[in-house]
Amino acid sequence: MFAFLTSKKVGILPSRWGSSRFPGKPLAKILGKTLVQRSYENALSSQSLDCVVVATDDQRIFDHVVEFGGLCVMTSTSCANGTERVEEVVSRHFPQAEIVVNIQGDEPCLSPTVIDGLVSTLENNPAADMVTPVTETTDPEAILTDHKVKCVFDKNGKALYFSRSAIPHNFKHPTPIYLHIGVYAFRKAFLSEYVKIPPSSLSLAEDLEQLRVLETGRSIYVHVVQNATGPSVDYPEDITKVEQYLLCLSKASF
């Protein structure tokens, strides 16, 4: 636990059992390893984090993480979302933390370089309260589905809006469309403020909690990445997609 006391850059993976779309998802097997283990080991490969820990309120997940040698913290069952779970762990266990990265446990193909880029962007941009990655897409299915969040941002990388709709709407002039990747790097002080911001009209309408930040006038900056993530796991059928993606990566490395 000494690492908890001294860590300044912390990665936390909130993990819960009760997903409505895929109950027990963290312990689903992907080519012999569970989803939570793959996500954890990816985060450990980051060059910028001092410590990586799983945050859960489920004993089954806790026991599994400890079994494969990971660090895990039990949180209260009252956390309304993953961000609140992350903030609870940081406030209780990481007194020296300066930067906190909320790493989604359903992105087993996320490159650790994405985490490094978020931390670097936050360190080098005093105006940023938090940073999140985006990637350009031309995939019509991803653009049109409301399961994929799109983002528009200004020339300095400051997010203007996030939406489940296709934004911008290319009515007259073709413009790149960027998908949001659900990983966030916070300054610790702002994370404590963030969880106290009440839901806003836009965040409720889009079901995107980060919109409450924009509605209060605070800043989210983006870090543009390329080929840094593969398929995520939202439904049981996504497991096959992830396995095929990982097998292709393995073959390509030879």
Curated annotation (Swiss-Prot):
GO terms for cellular component: cytosol. Its EC number is 2.7.7.38. Pathway: Nucleotide-sugar biosynthesis; CMP-3-deoxy-D-manno-octulosonate biosynthesis; CMP-3-deoxy-D-manno-octulosonate from 3-deoxy-D-manno-octulosonate and CTP: step 1/1; Bacterial outer membrane biogenesis; lipopolysaccharide biosynthesis. InterPro entries: Cytidylyl_trans (IPR003329), KdsB (IPR004528), Nucleotide-diphossugar_trans (IPR029044). CDD domains: CMP-KDO-Synthetase. It catalyses: 3-deoxy-alpha-D-manno-oct-2-ulosonate + CTP = CMP-3-deoxy-beta-D-manno-octulosonate + diphosphate. The keyword Transcription regulation does not apply. SUPFAM superfamilies: Nucleotide-diphospho-sugar transferases (SSF53448). It comes from the Bacteria. It is found in: Cytoplasm. Keywords: Cytoplasm, Lipopolysaccharide biosynthesis, Nucleotidyltransferase, Transferase. GO terms for molecular function: 3-deoxy-manno-octulosonate cytidylyltransferase activity. One of its GO terms (biological process) is CMP-keto-3-deoxy-D-manno-octulosonic acid biosynthetic process. Gene3D superfamilies: Spore Coat Polysaccharide Biosynthesis Protein SpsA, Chain A (3.90.550.10). Belongs to the KdsB family. Activates KDO (a required 8-carbon sugar) for incorporation into bacterial lipopolysaccharide in Gram-negative bacteria. This is 3-deoxy-manno-octulosonate cytidylyltransferase. The lineage of its organism: Bacteria, Pseudomonadati, Chlamydiota, Chlamydiia, Chlamydiales.
